[in-house]
Structures are given as structure tokens and as C-alpha cells.
Amino acid sequence: LCELLECEPYLSGNVGSGSVEELAKWVEYITAEGGTLAELRAKNGRKEPWSLKYLGVGNESWGCGGNMRPEYYSDLYRRYATYCRNYDGSVLYKVASGASDYDYNWTKVLMNNIDLDQMDGISLHYYTVKGWDGSKGSATDFDTEWWYNMISKAVEVEEVIENHKAIMDAYDPKK
């Protein structure tokens, strides 16, 4: 699909229930020129390796990705990031599972506990859903009150981004 759309893939690795070995093998399967996993990829219909530029090390680790504390996730991130590399020689940008909305402490802990040479980015999760009670609402069938609620929350995203950026800049002003 990414080749058809001419865009870069983003692979999100499972650190909640998957192993370091499993994620490292997925990256090898995708990017290796030769070896057992490249042979398996060819057997599955794809002889040439894919290009992989972005690797998300976990996703929503503060919630459904493991309900982790940022300190614990930071330790896992360092472990997983150590063993994941591209087999085609290109740079693999490793992206940490970032905070949800206004959880600035999550960003501070990650920036403080993960070596900057191991982390190339942090994802941000920000949602403009109706509620977290399991009923996120319809994408097309909503009333005026719901619409205004979503738009007002969307307007706040710039402030959230700027606040997380300020924290990251304090630890790494050159990026």
C-alpha cells in the first residue's frame, strides 16, 4: 500500500505483549537482503526487501498498549531500541510512544530517561472523541453540540503540541 501511495511506512512494534526478539525479527523480515527471514519473505511472495524508515517502539503504552508508567516504558524502550536495526544499511528512525493529550510528565520522563541517541522522535496522541466511555460517536451522524465540542477540542491541539515541544527542546534544543 505504501508503495502505491508513494509514502513511507510506519511500523508500530508491540512492547506490551510482544518480545524484543519478535520485534527485531519483524524488522529483519521486512528489510534483510538475505537470510532465513528474507527467504521466508520470498516464500510469502515478496523477494525484495521493503524500505523501513520509521519504527514506533510501542503504541499507546500509557493505555491499551500496556497501561505502563513512563519510567517502566522508558526502560522497555531502551531495551527494544537496542536490538532493532535496519538490515539494508539505511537509518531506522526509532519513535517512542508519546503522551496522551496533556500528560506532560510522560514526555519529561521519556526525555530524562532515554538516551537521545536511541530516540529519534516521540509520537503524540491527541483525540477529539465524544467520550472515553466506549461510545466514541459516529463519524457522520452527530448533532451540533457534539460538533462544537469536537471543534473546540481540536483548537487546543496547537497548545498541546507547543507544550510538549518546549519540554523536548529543554532536553535537546538542537532537534
Model-found features: residue ranges?
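Alpha-helical scaffolding within the catalytic cores
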Residues: 1, 33-47, 78, 102-114
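Active-site-proximal beta-strand/loop segments in catalytic clefts of secreted hydrolases
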Residues: 12-16, 57-60, 97-100, 124-127
